[in-house]
From Swiss-Prot:
Protein name stated in the entry: Mast cell protease 2
Keywords of the record: Disulfide bond, Glycoprotein, Hydrolase, Protease, Serine protease, Signal, Zymogen
Top-tier EC class: hydrolase
Location of the active site: 65 (charge relay system), 109 (charge relay system), 202 (charge relay system)
Keyword Isomerase: no
Signal peptide residue numbers: 1-18
Length: 244
């Protein structure tokens, strides 16, 4: 139940009050050309948003708990309230949720979106590399995540892309999370600072040395954030990418 609560918090409407924030700075416009902004409708009919990232011209990776209907993807965005000439808005043709996804625990929180057409790659819209199966990031590594989530507990969701640097933590650091599996997930942040993912940041990448190692999955007050560990899922990912 505890895991369910903080997964739900990442998707709460802007007035619902999440406990943690991204706590970073505004990103340089279009400096992260792989970033995707997702808009979708939940089962109860509410309009929500998540982050994601482009891993192939026609595929976006995000969190499985960001699934919904009428998923629209905006690429090349910095300010999502403006009609920027760099933006490419593409609807989703098909969703691929990991068959073992568990909403309550947050395990296998990964989803691929096949776009209706390929993105036009350029300096503002581009793919990000994935790790190898043996690329297991170790504690102490400094990485980055980004998103359009809330900038403070009582602040609205950000309209511009923000980024924050996080430290990869060891297993002990995520002991406050009711469900955590070191093989399936990455623990990043700090238990003593407010730098973390938060409301509206789900699905965004954890980037280390220009490689996407994680997917923003869940967070909890006074604990590091949890990211889905991408290297574990590579066989499934490449199987989906090869599908028609």
């Amino acid at each position: 139940m505890q895991a369910l609560l903080f997964l739900m918090a990442l998707l709460l409407p802007s007035g619902a009050g999440a406990e943690e924030i991204i706590g970073g700075v505004e990103a340089k416009p279009h400096s992260r050309p792989y970033m995707a902004y997702l808009k979708f409708t939940t089962k109860n009919g509410s309009k929500e948003r998540c982050g994601g990232f482009l891993i192939a011209p026609q595929f976006v990776m995000t969190a499985a708990h960001c699934n919904g209907s009428e998923i629209s993807v905006i690429l090349g965005a910095h300010n999502i309230n403006k009609n920027e000439p760099t933006q490419q808005i593409i609807k989703t043709e098909k969703t691929f949720v990991h068959p073992k996804f568990q909403y309550l625990s947050g395990f296998y929180d990964i989803m691929l979106l096949k776009l209706q057409k390929k993105a036009e790659l350029n300096s503002d819209v581009d793919v990000i590399s994935l790790p190898s199966s043996s690329d297991f990031i170790k504690p102490g590594k400094m990485c980055w995540t980004a998103g359009w989530g809330k900038t403070g507990k009582n602040n609205p969701l950000s309209v511009t892309l923000r980024e924050v640097e996080l430290r990869i933590m060891d297993q002990e650091a995520c002991k406050d999370h009711s469900d955590y599996d070191y093989q399936l997930q990455v623990c990043a942040g700090s238990p003593t600072t407010s730098k973390s993912i938060g409301q509206g940041d789900s699905g965004g990448p954890l980037v280390c040395d220009s490689v996407a190692h994680g997917i923003a999955s869940s967070y909890e007050a006074k604990a590091p954030a949890v990211f889905t560990r991408i290297s574990y899922y590579l066989p499934w990912i490449y199987k989906v990418l090869k599908s028609k």
